[in-house]
Amino acid sequence: MIRKAVIPVAGFGTRLLPITKAQPKEMLPVVNKPIVQYVVEDLVEAGVKDILFVTGKGKQAIENHFDVNYELECKLEKSGKYELLKIIKEIDRLGNIFYVRQKEQKGLGDAILYGEEFVGEEYFIAMVGDTIYSKNIVKDLIKAHEKYGCSVIALERVPKEDVYKYGVIDGEEIEKGVYKIKNMVEKPKVEEAPSNLIITGAYLLSPKIFEKIRETPPGRGGEIQITDAMNLLLKEEDIIGVEINCKRYDIGDALGWLKANVEIGAERFPEFREFLKEFVKNL
C-alpha cells in the first residue's frame, strides 16, 4: 500500500513572471481551485494521505491554503453561506499535510531527497506541483506497481520536435502502454533522443532512490536531476513506465495556464462552454 507522497514546490516560477513574483505558481487558479489542490485531491483519492511539501521562500500561501482558517469559517457560518463553508472544510481535511523547506534550489532530485526522513523505507509517490491531469494517474501508477513490484513513472508521447524540453526514456514495450525502461536522458537534442516518450513529472519510487540521489553528481546549472538518479537505480532495480491515457496540463508558462483554465473550465461549467462557442464565432 502506498501511503506517502512528496511534492516539490520550491521553484520560483520564472516563466510565469511577473504573476509569480509574490504568488507561488502552484497557487495560481485553474477555474475555481489552485493548481496544487488538484494534485493533492488526486493523491488523497488514490489513498495517499500523508503528503510532504518541499517548499522554499515565498511559499507560505500553500501552507495557508491547506490550513484551517477559523476566522473565515466562523464568518461563513454566521453569514449562512453553508455551501462555501462545506467547500472550505473539505480543503482542511485533505490528507495529513507536512512541510520541509529546501534551503537551496538544486534540482528536482535534491528536492525529493528532502523527503527521505518522511518516507522512511516505503515506496512513495513524487509529483511536481504545477501539472494537472484529466484523470487520476496516481491510481495507474499504483496499479502498475502492484503488478510489477518496482518503481513506476508516468510517460506521455509527444511530437518528436518537442523532446528537447523533457526527460526522455529508452525502453521496451512489455504490454500495451507499459515499458521496461533501459535508460533516461534529460532534455536531449532532437536527433539524439531515444524515443518520443517523455517523463511527465509523476513518479512512484523505491526508497532506494534516496541513496542514488546522494550518489548523483550535479549536472548543468549545478542541479541534481532525478533522471540521473533513476539511471543509477536502474543498475539495481527495474523501473516501469506507464503511458498516460489522458490530457496533461503543464502549467509552467502563461500559455499552459490559460489553456488549462479554458479547457477545464469548458469541461466543468456548461455555461462557460456556451460562452466560448459564441466568443470564438466573433473572433
UniProtKB/Swiss-Prot annotation:
It is an enzyme of class 2 (transferase). GO terms for biological process: biosynthetic process; UDP-alpha-D-glucose metabolic process. One of its GO terms (molecular function) is UTP:glucose-1-phosphate uridylyltransferase activity. It catalyses: alpha-D-glucose 1-phosphate + UTP + H(+) = UDP-alpha-D-glucose + diphosphate. Its EC number is 2.7.7.9. Keywords: Nucleotidyltransferase, Transferase. InterPro entries: GalU_uridylyltTrfase_bac/arc, NTP_transferase_dom, Nucleotide-diphossugar_trans. NCBIfam families: galU (TIGR01099). Belongs to the UDPGP type 2 family. This is Putative UTP--glucose-1-phosphate uridylyltransferase. It comes from Methanocaldococcus jannaschii (strain ATCC 43067 / DSM 2661 / JAL-1 / JCM 10045 / NBRC 100440).
